[in-house]
Structures are given as C-alpha cells and as structure tokens.
C-alpha cells in the first residue's frame, strides 16, 4: 500500500503513544501520552501561550505546566484530553487528514465495552475516518513475534496483562490483569530515592526519575544475593547527572525498583508477581494447550525492557511449572513497539481488509457495531 491510502496505526499506551503507517516496520511518531496545562494563566506574556500542550512539547515545558495522563491503567479516563492526543497524532505528528485513511486503534484486554464504543464514536464523528478497527494489544504483540499461539505478558506504563492466545484468538476467561506497571515502578523509585536523601515530588521530577529508571535499572536473577553484593561492595553503584548538574549515586535501588514486578508486596500490593500471574493464566487454559503456552511465552511492552527480566522469568516459571515442561521466554529486541508492529502487520494483510468497520456500517448500527466486528 502506498502512503496516500495507507491505514494509520495508533497504539495509545498509558505512557507513550506510538503512531505510523501500516506496512512500515516501526512507528513514525512516538511521544508521551501527556496533556499539559499552564499552572498559572498569563505568566508567559507575549509567548503566545496556548491553553494546552501535548506530548513532547508538554514534556519540554513541564516546569510551567501541570501534566496529566488521560490514559490510566491502559484505559481512557479523560476523553477530552484523549481527543487532543489523537488530534495531535494526526495533524502534528503524522501530518495526515484522518478522513482519508482507515485507522487501526489498540485497546487493553478486558477493556470496558463503553470505552471501545466511545473510541469508535470519536473516530467516525469527530475525525470522520472512512473506516476503523480496534484490536487487542497483546494479540498484536503475538502477531509481531510471528506466532498465532502463545501467552503474552504485556507490561507497559499503566497496566500489565497476561493474555493466552490460541490460533489467533485471545482466551478471555484466562486473561489476567495486574495494575502494576511502569508508572508504579517510577513512583516506587521516587520513594526509595527519597529514603536515600534525594527528593523528587512534582510531576516534572517524576519524568526525571523515569529516565533514571530506564537508563539504570535491571532485574536481579537472585534478589537476596544481589542485595548482599550491593551491601558489601560498591560494584553495583552508578551515578546519574540531574538536569541541574547535580550528580546522584544509585546502588541497590537499581534492582530493588523492578523487583516489585516479582514481589508486589514492595508496593504494598497483595497481588501475585508477573511470574505467578503468567503461570496462573496458563493454568486457566485447557490442559491440552498449556504445553504450547509454556513454550511460547512472549514478553512485550516497555516495562519488559529491563536487562535480566527474561532470565528471571525463565527461572521463576521453571520453578512453578511441571519439571518436564519445556519453557521458552521470548523477548524480541523491538518489544517496546511490538504492539504497534503487530498492528502494522495486521492492517496491511489483504485478508484483513474486509474486517474494517466502515463509516456506512457505523451510520447504520451506531457505536455498538464495534462489538460485532472487533473481537
């Protein structure tokens, strides 16, 4: 497909929005899912101040803004802001007219029905798209890894899901959701850095801590052993320069932060860790397909980017599973964007073209058409 009629693929994550054209191998635009509003009206006289900023511009002016994320735990909570993000995506990032392109959107598994209806309504009524489709994020990640059967552990900024998929269809009864993801880990890192004497409190400072997390954190293979190493030597210490030039040193926080994925009690949560959640998800599936799921456990999303996470998952799931079971954790290098890549693949398949919801179908049936056509 050439660019002029190419479908648009928009993966709206809680933390980052990934957007581009179907058939491309990577998103053209990746920007934070943030809408910022000035804290004080009219401070910047003559700056042509806008009443709201989106994405990177909001990020760069964060000192004078209050930042809000319209997507929480993978689900849209503020539709006005969400519309701003979509508007920004089409007109500023991709520079396309949405009324000329089919749009593929993504959604969290177990997304409330009203949410997908609202997405559908906004696409057809506000942006006048000729056609659209809503696909489940984890299923797209599996397609991107070249499989149609497997279990996806998808962990982003706002939510973590384990989604077993058989022959291309998600098994809804076995999907498990964990409200513990990147943003919680950033908040936890803010907290444990405060214990070290560094204070990070504002929404702007949270973004600095997110950067520290992304650059320096890793998952320990054996947490207790790593704690002992950190206590007895400075070999694990790293330094980080803050925007104001101050240099901070971070030690065991580097692996204590993502350890919360395996031990949510660190965050005061009673849920199971990602390893147990994955295992529980597999156990909710038919006994005959479990073997295929254990052997095709695919990691996806930005929160699976920590060095060491795949080895640790392998170790933990091996300990839970039957001893003879073959376990394979697949961690594709591009997994940060695998939902988007899967969407790009799906939207450019010739067999997919009859799956789009057309404007005509929407006009006849209304928003509820989405439940009949997207599953």
From Swiss-Prot:
Bridged cysteine pairs (disulfide): none
A molecular-function term among this protein's GO annotations: ATP binding
EC number(s) from the headed UniProt entry: 3.6.4.-
Enzyme class: hydrolase
Modified residues (Methionine (R)-sulfoxide): 44, 47
Places the protein is found: Cytoplasm, Cytoskeleton; Nucleus
N-acetylaspartate: modified positions: 2
N-acetylmethionine found at: 1
SUPFAM superfamilies: Actin-like ATPase domain
One GO cellular component term: dense body
Catalytic reaction list: ATP + H2O = ADP + phosphate + H(+)
Family: Belongs to the actin family.
Function: Actin is a highly conserved protein that polymerizes to produce filaments that form cross-linked networks in the cytoplasm of cells. Actin exists in both monomeric (G-actin) and polymeric (F-actin) forms, both forms playing key functions, such as cell motility and contraction. In addition to their role in the cytoplasmic cytoskeleton, G- and F-actin also localize in the nucleus, and regulate gene transcription and motility and repair of damaged DNA.
PANTHER family associated with the record: ACTIN (PTHR11937)
Note in the entry: In vertebrates 3 main groups of actin isoforms, alpha, beta and gamma have been identified. The alpha actins are found in muscle tissues and are a major constituent of the contractile apparatus. The beta and gamma actins coexist in most cell types as components of the cytoskeleton and as mediators of internal cell motility.
Protein name in UniProt: Actin, cytoplasmic 1
Organism: Xenopus tropicalis (Western clawed frog)
């Amino acid at each position: 497909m050439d660019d002029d009629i190419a479908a648009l693929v928009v993966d709206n994550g809680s933390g980052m929005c990934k957007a581009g054209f179907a058939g491309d191998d990577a998103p053209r635009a990746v920007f934070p899912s943030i809408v910022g509003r000035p804290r004080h009206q009219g401070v910047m006289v003559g700056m042509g101040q806008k009443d709201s900023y989106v994405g990177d511009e909001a990020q760069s002016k964060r000192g004078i803004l209050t930042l809000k994320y319209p997507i929480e735990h993978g689900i849209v909570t503020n539709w006005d802001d969400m519309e701003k993000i979509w508007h920004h995506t089409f007109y500023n990032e991709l520079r396309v007219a949405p009324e000329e392109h089919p749009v593929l959107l993504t959604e969290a598994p177990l997304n409330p029905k009203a949410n997908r209806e609202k997405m559908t309504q906004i696409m057809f009524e506000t942006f006048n798209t000729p056609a659209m489709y809503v696909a489940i994020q984890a299923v797209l990640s599996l397609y991107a890894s070249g499989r149609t059967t497997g279990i996806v552990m998808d962990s982003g900024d706002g939510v973590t899901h384990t989604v077993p998929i058989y022959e291309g269809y998600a098994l809804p009864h076995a999907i498990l959701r964990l409200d513990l993801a990147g943003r919680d880990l950033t908040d936890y890192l803010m907290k444990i850095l405060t214990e070290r004497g560094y204070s990070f409190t504002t929404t702007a400072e949270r973004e600095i801590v997110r950067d520290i997390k992304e650059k320096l954190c890793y998952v320990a293979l054996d947490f207790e052993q790593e704690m002992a190493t950190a206590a007895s030597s400075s070999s694990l210490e790293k330094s980080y320069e803050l925007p104001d030039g101050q240099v901070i040193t971070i030690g065991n926080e580097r692996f204590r932060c993502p350890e919360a994925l395996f031990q949510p009690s660190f965050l005061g949560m009673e849920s199971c860790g990602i390893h147990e959640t994955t295992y529980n998800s597999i156990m909710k599936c038919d006994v005959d397909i479990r073997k295929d799921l254990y052997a095709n456990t695919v990691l996806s999303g930005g929160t699976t980017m920590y060095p060491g996470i795949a080895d640790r998952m392998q170790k933990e799931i091996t300990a839970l599973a039957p001893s003879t079971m073959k376990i394979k954790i697949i961690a594709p290098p591009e997994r940060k964007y695998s939902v988007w890549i899967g969407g790009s693949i799906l939207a450019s398949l010739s067999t997919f073209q009859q799956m789009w919801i057309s404007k005509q179908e929407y006009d006849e049936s209304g928003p509820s058409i989405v439940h009949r056509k997207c599953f």
